[in-house]
Swiss-Prot record:
Function: Catalyzes the reversible phosphorylytic cleavage of uridine to uracil and ribose-1-phosphate.
Organism field: Klebsiella aerogenes
PANTHER family found in the cross-reference section: FI09636P-RELATED, URIDINE PHOSPHORYLASE
Record's protein name: Uridine phosphorylase
Record text on subunit structure and interactions: Homohexamer.
Length: 253
């Protein structure tokens, strides 16, 4: 390869300065915000949906790298970060809750994901569970409690698509294939907390390859009440989730 050690991220092992933990938001615009909460933030690279920064927590290096939306791009980010030395991944995102008792602004820590994606099948058969690492989960729960966040711990439905896979009918065709008709009600009955689009791939990849991963998300809408989040609520919820993931990273270093 050229000057970088990995094809898509444009990073070298030297860029990481020995970092073994990465915080992985989906949105590239969140990367700098997260890095800014730590010491000595420095931008490393930006290619397509992948923006990466390095910073320090208590003198130890941490990488922040966006994954983009969905499993395929997440798998690229995780694969290439692992190649240059990352062994622990903390995903931070926003989400829509599907349980009536979960409020907008609450925080969800995922223990495992319903594998509604396709990318995770490229790493392990469907019988293999998409489970979070216990130490990562514990750190996220403790970090959430430390800032007084109302926290729910449980299972997430992780879909390849935002619309049909999450049983949304407000689309061009208004059509949802039979596989997903009534699926949200089924997940609700099973106690699934929410939908998002990356955790099944992340957790399956890491659990099946000896890597550690955890997942935290801020609730920006409860789909039993409405579909469109409030912009100010989104901003506040994102801020809380970012603080939690940084504090969890500190506990894991």
């Amino acid at each position: 390869m050229s000057k970088s050690d990995v094809f898509h991220l444009g990073l070298t092992k030297n860029d990481l300065q020995g970092a073994t933990l990465a915080i992985v938001p989906g949105d590239p615009e969140r990367v700098e915000k997260i890095a800014a909460l730590m010491d000595k933030p420095v931008k490393l690279a930006s290619h397509r949906e992948f923006t990466s920064w390095r910073a320090e927590l208590d003198g130890k290096p941490v990488i922040v790298c966006s994954t983009g939306i969905g499993g395929p791009s997440t798998s690229i980010a995780v694969e290439e970060l692992a190649h240059v030395g990352v062994r622990t991944f903390l995903r931070i995102g926003t989400t829509g809750a599907i349980q009536p008792h979960i409020n907008v602004g609450d925080v969800l820590v995922t223990t495992g994901s319903v594998r509604l994606d396709g990318a995770s099948l490229h790493f392990a058969p469907m019988e293999f569970p998409a489970v979070a690492d216990f130490a990562c989960t514990t750190a996220l729960v403790e970090a959430a409690k430390s800032i007084g966040a109302t926290t729910h711990i449980g299972v997430t439905a992780s879909s390849d698509t935002f619309y049909p896979g999450q049983e949304r009918y407000d689309t061009f065709s208004g059509r949802v294939v039979s596989r997903f008709k009534g699926s949200m009600e089924e997940w609700q009955a099973m106690g699934v907390m929410n939908y998002e689009m990356e955790s099944a791939t992340l957790l399956t990849m890491c659990a099946s390859q000896g890597l550690r991963a955890g997942m935290v998300a801020g609730v920006i809408v409860n789909r039993t009440q409405q579909e469109i989040p409030n912009a100010e609520t989104m901003k506040q919820t994102e801020s809380h989730a970012v603080k939690i993931v940084v504090e969890a990273a500190r506990r894991l270093l």
